[in-house]
Amino acid sequence: MPFLHLFTPYTNADNTKLILRVNESRLRLFTRQLLAEFFGTLFVVYIVSGSTLAANFAVSDPIVRVCLICLVQGFAFAAIIWSISGISGCQLNPAVTVGCVTTGRMGILNGIAFIIFQCVGALVGAGMMKASLPTFYERDLSATTLATGVNVARGFFLEMVTTSFLVFVVLGVAVYNEWDPKISRVAPLAIGCAVIAGVGFLNLFTGGSLNPARSFGPAVFSDTWHRHYIYWFGPICGGIIAGLFWRIFLSEKVLLIDRPYTDFHRSTYGTATK
């Protein structure tokens, strides 16, 4: 099949064509998943860092500033999740990945690989933002730091509880929701709303991380490491708590069986699949 076409070879409206999903190797699927996590986290960190810097420079009213920051982050997450969730689940967050591993729905080695590519994507996204801005606008590249009066214990607790809320929502609408496709279709919006709520609540106290990768990228390029460990231990503990809560108390018992009868079946999205 040629790489480029002079004319569009088919459209979804062409009744003479049938789109079939071709089986692919596990290695190719896993590679696509890792690349999806890499590029998704890259875009998230780039947009989050840029929007935070823009709000801090352009908006003097603190309420408007926080609203702008949390809305941009929430909508950015929702848009990216909608675009690539069919490939990797679009976790974009080591805390979410740890939560998925804790539930048993994701393998440990898969989770480690996801986290590595998320962190590399965060580094590239923060580096791109640093390269995009004049030195005057760089500052700390929106690295997350504790506010005055917020000690280590409070910062850890705030990040842990709020991230557990975010991961709780992710697991509920995207991981443990096997039976209602209507909820799956709006899952990115629900996750985006959880990000808006979490960032809006935490912004004043901890900078609103909820995501170790989001804090890691800007910290590297701005050399902002003061109590950085909070933004790893807090969210990851929150992810573990949410994962255990779903696994022990809220999950249904499911049974995995072989697909019966036919070689072809109709997929969730209505396209014929082999």
UniProtKB/Swiss-Prot annotation:
Protein name (Swiss-Prot/TrEMBL): Aquaporin C
Chain ranges for the short sequence motif NPA 1 as given in the UniProt record: 93-95
Record-level GO cellular component terms: plasma membrane
Positions of short motif NPA 2: 211-213
Kinase as UniProt keyword: no
Any one GO biological process: water transport
Membrane topology value: Multi-pass membrane protein
Keywords: Cell membrane, Membrane, Repeat, Transmembrane, Transmembrane helix, Transport
Predominant location: membrane
Cytoplasmic side of membrane: 1-33, 88-105, 176-185, 251-274
PANTHER family registered for this protein in UniProt: AQUAPORIN TRANSPORTER, MIP17260P
Organism: Dictyostelium discoideum
